[in-house]
Amino acid sequence: MSNLIPPHGGKGLVCCLLEGAELEAEKKKAATLPKLNISSRAKGDLIMMGIGGFSPLDGFMTKADWKGVCEDFLLADGTFWPIPVTLDASADDAAKINVGDEIALFDPEREEFMATMKVTEKYEMTEADKIFECEKVFMGEGTPTAEEFWKIAKDDHPGVQMVMNQGEFNLAGPVKVLSEAEYPEEYPGIYQRPAESRAIFEERGWKEIAAMQLRNPMHRSHEYLCKIAIEVCDGCFIHSLIGNLKPGDIPADVRVKCIDALVKNYFVEDKAVQGGYPLDMRYAGPREGLLHATFRQNYGCSRMIIGRDHAGVGDFYGMFEAQTIFDKIPTPEGEGKALLCTPLKIDWTFYCYKCDGMASLRTCPHAKEDRVLLSGTMLRKMLSEGGELPDHFGRDEVVAILREYYEGLTEKVEVKLHGAATGN
């Protein structure tokens, strides 16, 4: 029997990815079915459903699921889930699809069939529905009223833009996943299925694992957070987003090299595991933090490191709103229905010259002038402009990799700073 935290949902790992003869037969069948082109976001969602990362989901959400998740963080069956996982279709495409149809979900970028789907429901998403979803999922302490939110959200919030630009209908139903796309080949050993990360943790004898979410290269604060986690847990799972990012973000392969260099040179051997997952960012701030904890539970992690401005977007969210939201979510009764992965809440961290080391607001009594505030956004901005980094911002091995990347770019990358990145 496993010592690890059970997957979310009480059904074990729900994996929709076909293999062997069944996979080959379904691929042939997909070529004969009506084809629906899907977005990069839907592709990532399908892969996560395929490998069990989104357990207990086995398909795209019904309207009851969508509404329950938006309003109450609950699927229709009462299981906790923080963010809608839906498949949109244009009015023209939806008109050709009826409830009961089987369709093939096609990735136009790779020209590959990603899944087949049995359509169990087709529901309209009016502009009012999209506004409802945006206000429920994306509003935060930085814009506490709808009026304040919509003043800037349509232009400045990528998650809102994504939802408002979706098709006029959503399609729901179970899926059979046919591919993991480019991830196994491009990121061997980094891209992992939940069953694989669980096997690694079991082999090491770990029970309590903290997950570290990354979409920026690791700087000293990231390193410090991971080492705090290692002090109180058996190990740390450094888990990077390797799906689509915002323009100006550093590519996954460069970030992987940075993590490798840092772990090799500054971590005790066998206390950290690096992994990657195939989702796109949803830019949902605190709710995205909950999603990170939910699927990390499926990967075998019992704790989720939540620091300052986790999954933040500009100034839409409070600095620690992604921590406090864990205290407000429902805890439904029934096996597997509640979220079991708990937050490891850590205050704002920085390098302090007077402390002569890394510290946090909880441990350092010194003035702002004595501190080097660290953020991934600021790191990218300084390097993209060819500037010198302050001492103690990043490890030399990591900075060398990043400088080489930026020096090789043919076009300058503009990086904008917001309050979270500047310390304001």
Curated annotation (Swiss-Prot):
Keywords: ATP-binding, Nucleotide-binding, Nucleotidyltransferase, Transferase. Its EC number is 2.7.7.4. The keyword Nucleotidyltransferase applies. The keyword Secreted does not apply. InterPro entries: ATP-Sase_PUA-like_dom (IPR025980), PUA-like_sf (IPR015947), Rossmann-like_a/b/a_fold (IPR014729), SO4_adenylyltransferase_pro (IPR020792), Sulfurylase_cat_dom (IPR024951), Sulphate_adenylyltransferase (IPR002650). It comes from the Bacteria. GO terms for biological process: hydrogen sulfide biosynthetic process; sulfate assimilation. Coiled coil: none annotated. Gene3D superfamilies: HUPs, Sulfate adenylyltransferase. One of its GO terms (molecular function) is sulfate adenylyltransferase (ATP) activity. It catalyses: sulfate + ATP + H(+) = adenosine 5'-phosphosulfate + diphosphate. Pathway: Sulfur metabolism; hydrogen sulfide biosynthesis; sulfite from sulfate: step 1/3. Pfam families: ATP-sulfurylase (PF01747), PUA_2 (PF14306). Belongs to the sulfate adenylyltransferase family. PANTHER family: PTHR43509, SULFATE ADENYLYLTRANSFERASE (PTHR43509:SF1). This is Sulfate adenylyltransferase. It comes from Desulfatibacillum aliphaticivorans.
